[in-house]
């Protein structure tokens, strides 16, 4: 996929850069693989805002994506590539030899009519799913499991990937996008390739309305608020905030370490992404 720079016919289109989706499916999603989705608007079960700057947006249907890829030894043909409003990556609709349909995350370079497969007999090609022990060092992978059979968790966003670094006994060393090197059980599955829509990081929405279509609400600066609403608020005239940047709850930002010390999973992290 490439980028599409819009002509400045109107002020809102000036500087707008979007991903070109002309090669994607233009019809409705597969009816058997969608379910209804109720937007939370950033609220919890009590109606309290737990995530700010969310709300509104276009109505969406949730596409049921197969993150486990546990149908081994059965080839599947890519029927079409689709846009998914619920994530930044594109989806691929695949059909197995027995007729079953499924959505998977589309890796970069996957095309319609390509044949993919999961399991021990699969080649190391984009879209094929194998155990980490069967993937050679240096290979880029995505949709990596952290628990055996639990489904892929690591590297699922557009353009993301992890790199197989080597073996460490029953584990495989993975370098994540953050620079962290982590040990994962070698029997966990991963899909070969980089997630599609690599140009997602380069888009420019161009206007506030396009953010609202995506369900994103305005982000008000703390220095523009009143003292009751934010530690940076208040003051006579325009101020700098008077202190180092903090969240509305007073927690320092811009470098503050948020991971708890002594977590059980620390033993699986060989190189941290945070420089101490």
UniProtKB/Swiss-Prot annotation:
Residues 254-264 have a biased composition (Basic residues). One of its GO terms (molecular function) is transferase activity. Transmembrane segments: none annotated. Keywords: Ribonucleoprotein, Ribosomal protein, RNA-binding, rRNA-binding. SUPFAM superfamilies: Nucleic acid-binding proteins, Translation proteins SH3-like domain. One of its GO terms (cellular component) is large ribosomal subunit. Coiled coil: none annotated. One of its GO terms (biological process) is cytoplasmic translation. Residues 224-276 are annotated as: Disordered. One of the primary rRNA binding proteins. Required for association of the 30S and 50S subunits to form the 70S ribosome, for tRNA binding and peptide bond formation. It has been suggested to have peptidyltransferase activity; this is somewhat controversial. Makes several contacts with the 16S rRNA in the 70S ribosome. Part of the 50S ribosomal subunit. Forms a bridge to the 30S subunit in the 70S ribosome. HAMAP family: Ribosomal_uL2_B. Belongs to the universal ribosomal protein uL2 family. This is Large ribosomal subunit protein uL2. The gene is rplB.
């Amino acid at each position: 996929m490439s980028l599409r720079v819009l002509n400045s016919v109107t002020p809102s289109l000036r500087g707008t850069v979007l991903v070109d989706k002309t090669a994607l499916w233009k019809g409705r999603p597969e009816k058997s693989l969608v379910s209804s989705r109720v937007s939370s608007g950033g609220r919890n079960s009590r109606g309290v805002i737990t995530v700010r700057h969310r709300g509104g947006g276009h109505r969406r249907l949730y596409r049921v994506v197969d993150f486990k890829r546990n149908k081994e030894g059965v080839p599947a043909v890519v029927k079409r590539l689709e846009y998914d409003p619920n994530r930044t990556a594109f989806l691929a609709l695949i059909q197995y030899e027995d007729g079953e349909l499924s959505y998977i995350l589309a890796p970069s370079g996957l095309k319609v009519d390509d044949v993919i497969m999961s399991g021990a007999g699969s080649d190391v090609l984009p879209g094929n799913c194998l155990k980490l022990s069967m993937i050679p060092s240096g290979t880029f992978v995505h949709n990596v499991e952290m628990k055996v059979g639990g489904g892929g968790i690591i590297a699922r966003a557009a353009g993301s990937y992890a790199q197989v670094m080597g073996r460490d006994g029953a584990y495989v060393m993975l370098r994540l996008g953050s620079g962290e090197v982590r040990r994962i059980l070698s029997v966990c599955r991963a899909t070969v390739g980089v997630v599609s829509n690599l140009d997602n990081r380069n888009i420019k929405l161009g206007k506030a309305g396009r953010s609202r279509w995506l369900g994103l609400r305005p982000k008000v600066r703390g220095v523009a608020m009143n003292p009751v609403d934010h530690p940076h608020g208040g003051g006579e005239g325009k101020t700098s905030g008077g202190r180092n940047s903090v969240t509305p709850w007073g927690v320092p930002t811009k470098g503050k370490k948020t991971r708890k010390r002594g977590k059980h999973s620390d033993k699986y992290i060989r190189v941290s992404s945070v420089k101490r």
